[in-house]
Design a protein with these regions (language model features):
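A short N-terminal beta->alpha junction/helix N-cap motif
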Residues: 16-24, 51-52, 265, 269
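Alpha/beta enzyme core
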Residues: 4-14, 26-51, 58-74, 81-209, ...
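C-terminal alpha-helical cap/extension of soluble enzyme domains
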Residues: 220-287
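Active-site-facing substrate-recognition patch
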Residues: 1
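Histidine-centered catalytic micro-motifs
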Residues: 19-24, 77-82, 209-220, 238
Length: 287
């Protein structure tokens, strides 16, 4: 099968995007894998620090490899939002295909310093591990929000020059810039619109060897997704939307059969709900 780097490069050339979806258990993983097989595209599984603590890094790696073999499609594993260098190193040691060093709350200099340390460790590990970093603050929530958090300033965004300098100074393979996006989903309305021209400028500035990653994809309109991908984003993260679908499917199953106590008889409804969301997103990202 193709490597993650080859998959991302191909997506960039074809102006499509690879979907990245977070999991907390094997049930969600199976729903995502089934959707990717149906659409016929590779997919990336993400596990945040909290999700890694719950699932276990080595277990997440083993589950992902097993799912890729079972479903017959490329499935890759990413250590999502690691806030420490040691966390990234641990994920690399556990066999992850990609890691994200999230240093946006550090000073710009410290963010670059720690990101570069992760890049250097990845280059020496004996495998082709993708290293991603974040540039600009878009919040930390994965919940339904009443409004944009006060600490997220949608107009204070990094420039294309900032993006190019960060890539040059750190050597990252992928960059997730703030472009008007937001972690979490706003209740009853779409998330703020993206700065499409800024994405185009950043794509030009960082070059064709670096993936541009859209975080905070949950809550965006289909039109925003398409415009962002056309402008140069070749990897899209979805998490909150998956969590809402999973919980909703399980709650619906228990409401229909409140006496049910066998987990496999109601958890599968959550899996099916996840599969539906992922299928729709993958079809959109790859069209």
């Amino acid at each position: 099968m193709l490597s993650l780097r080859e998959v991302l490069d191909d997506a960039m050339k074809r102006k499509v995007a690879i979907g990245h979806f977070n999991i907390s258990d094997s049930n969600q993983l199976n729903g995502i894998a089934a959707a990717a097989r149906e659409v016929g595209v590779p997919v990336i599984i993400g596990v945040s620090e909290g999700e890694r603590e719950f699932v276990g890094g080595k277990k997440a790696s083993a589950m992902t490899r097993a799912a890729s073999k079972e479903f017959g499609i490329p499935i890759f594993l990413n250590a999502d939002h690691s806030h420490s260098v040691d966390g990234c190193k641990s994920a690399i040691d556990d066999g992850f295909d990609a890691v994200i060093f999230d240093g946006v709350e550090l000073s710009p200099g410290e963010n670059k310093k720690h990101t570069k340390e992760v890049v250097e460790y990845a280059r020496k590990c004996g495998r082709d591990v993708i290293v991603e970093a974040e540039l600009g603050y878009i919040g930390t929530s994965s919940k339904l929000l009443d409004d944009v958090p006060e600490d997220v300033i949608l107009d204070a965004l990094p420039s294309a020059q900032d993006a190019a300098e960060f890539v040059s100074d750190t050597g990252v393979d992928a960059l997730a810039p703030a472009v008007g996006n937001l972690h979490g989903m706003l209740k009853g309305r779409s998330n703020p619109s993206l700065k499409i021209e800024l994405i185009k400028e950043m794509r030009e500035a960082v070059g064709s060897d670096v993936s541009l990653v859209l975080h905070g994809g949950s809550g965006l309109s289909d039109d925003d997704f398409k415009k962002a991908i056309d402008a140069g984003m070749n990897l899209v993260h979805i998490n909150t939307e998956i969590r809402i679908a999973y919980r909703g499917g399980i709650e619906k199953a228990l409401k229909e059969k409140p006496e049910e106590v066998a987990p496999y008889r109601y958890l599968n409804k959550g899996r099916d709900a996840v599969m539906e969301v992922v299928r729709d997103r993958l079809q959109l990202f790859s069209s």
